[in-house]
Regions:
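Right-handed parallel beta-helix/beta-spiral solenoid domain characteristic of secreted/periplasmic
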Residues: 31, 52, 64-106
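Sec/Tat signal peptide C-region and signal peptidase I cleavage site
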Residues: 20-24
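Acidic Gly/Asp/Thr-rich repetitive segments characteristic of extracellular carbohydrate-active
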Residues: 25-56
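Extracellular beta-strand/beta-solenoid scaffold signature
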Residues: 77-85, 100-110, 122-132, 144-154, ...
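Acidic, glycine- and Ser/Thr-rich low-complexity intrinsically disordered tracts
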Residues: 46-49, 74, 299, 304, ...
Length: 381
């Protein structure tokens, strides 16, 4: 009995050692060889090291492995399909130049993958996540696709430190990063420029964090939320030089928009079509046609401690924007510091109003019946 137990213990140790060796295996693929053949031979946990060259194939990853490019090998799927499809959880893709004309550069239908330091171009979607969770997408250069990164029904992913530009090859629909029916994602510290309709678009997506992104020179919006994209946090982004709004909400509620910079847009921050119960706080909007614009039944929003400087209008409310609370804002050197054609908007909270560089003792807001009974005589520092 003791001999049998000892034999089983030795066998268990041997199995662990061989499993460890298998996890550490590295398979090298040279120019002219097949990456897919190496994937088929690999065991879970293996690393496939691909040397420089052009590989004309569409890869299917059906097991968790690391695929590493040396000196930026190119995967060109042509009309065959997506460049790489991740079916298995827990893979890592790094160091590739990925191109395809018909489909997606990297198509993810699995969880807990890492996609980093790749160049992806000339695709329908550069990277697409479809019902995929907890993936990390970082430090990629994604350019000249229809959409840079597209998430569909995908939650708890992190997209950070990517350079996403010129994703506008299809004029009907083009975005830098687009989310649909997706929640609890973190999108932060990306550089997005010249991405067609919008650099960062959320549709029917809730509880996402958009933080510290630099967004510029889009045909319509820098950041856009639509179709009940509710309860998102938009903070510390810089939206510059977009043809319409730096930040745009359409039919979206209970979002927090704070500490953003929006400058040189047609509108800095624009709420429209029943975008209600949002908080706009500590934003800096300057050199826009309208700094902050509320329209089309956008109601019950709170605008607090924002600075609007050198815009055509600092804060502009159209006739159907009502029951908004506006206080402790700094409206400085705008063509019109404030304009209110709405109804029942409050320009103070009963204790503090706003600072206007064209101050009167009681500030009657042009456009309608708006009155600030407690205007500040000096801006808060």
């Amino acid at each position: 009995m003791k001999h049998t137990a000892k034999h089983l213990a030795v066998l268990a140790v041997t199995v662990i050692i061989f499993a460890s060796w298998a996890e550490a295996a590295v398979i090298e693929v040279n120019s002219g060889e097949s990456i897919q053949a190496a994937v088929n031979l690999a065991n879970p946990g293996d690393t496939i090291s691909v040397q420089s060259g052009v590989f004309r194939e569409s890869l299917n990853m059906t097991k968790p492995i690391a695929l590493e490019g040396i000196d930026r090998p190119q995967i060109d799927a042509g009309a065959m399909g997506s460049g790489i499809t991740l079916f298995a959880d827990g893979s890592r893709i790094t160091g590739f130049d990925i191109r395809t004309t018909r489909r997606t550069g990297i198509y993810v239908i699995s969880d807990n993958n890492i996609i980093e330091n790749n160049t992806i171009s000339s695709c329908l979607d550069g990277i697409r996540l479809d019902r995929a969770q907890a993936n990390q997408i970082a430090a990629n250069d994604i350019n000249n696709n229809t959409n840079g990164i597209f998430l569909y029904a995908s939650n708890a992913n992190t997209i950070a430190h990517n350079n996403i530009r010129d994703n506008n090859i299809n004029e009907e629909s083009d975005c830098g990063i687009a989310l649909a029916y997706s929640g609890d994602n973190i999108i932060q510290y990306n550089d997005l420029t010249d991405n067609g309709d919008s650099s960062l678009s959320l549709r029917s997506s809730e509880n996402n964090t958009l933080r510290g992104n630099i967004i510029s020179n889009n045909d319509w919006y820098g950041i856009s939320l639509s179709e009940s994209s509710n309860k998102n946090l938009i903070e510390m982004n810089n939206a510059v030089g977009n043809k319409d709004a730096g930040i745009y909400l359409d039919s979206s509620r209970e979002n927090t928009i704070r500490e953003n910079i929006a400058s040189d847009n047609s509108r800095g921050i624009y709420l429209s079509f029943d975008s209600n119960d949002n908080i706009l706080q500590n934003n800096n909007v300057s050199s826009n046609g309208k700094g902050i614009h509320l329209a089309n039944h956008s109601s019950n929003n709170t605008l607090e401690n924002n600075t609007a400087r050198k815009n055509g209008y600092g804060i502009y409310l159209t006739f159907s924007a009502g029951w908004n609370l506006i206080f402790s804002n700094h409206l400085i050197d705008n063509g019109h510091n404030a304009y209110d054609r709405g109804q029942s908007n409050r320009w103070d909270n009963g204790e503090a109003g706003n600072y206007y560089s064209d101050l009167g003792r009681v500030f009657y807001v042009p456009g309608g019946a708006g009155v600030d009974s407690y205007p500040m005589t000096e801006p808060e520092l």
